[in-house]
């Protein structure tokens, strides 16, 4: 019998590609602004972190405790913008702004 991947597993696999991860983060950030819900972007960053080594590896690169990093990216967490940017950088990506 053929095994199928779940949505999350498939997403994490796709997010290992930096181009895909960049497009995903851009789309989620745009959606966050449109809906005034920054939680969307925060969870997108969490997905990218999971795809690029997980909480332990990325928090180590950021030189922060895994526990506080995990809490800040949880659904109930309120991550600072600087935390999100540092996590993105630790995943080998960067945040850019362009004229509208």
Give the positions of each predicted feature.
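Key DNA-contacting residues within the recognition helix of helix-turn-helix
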Residues: 70-71, 85
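Residue-level detection of the helix-turn-helix DNA-binding "recognition helix"
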Residues: 74-75
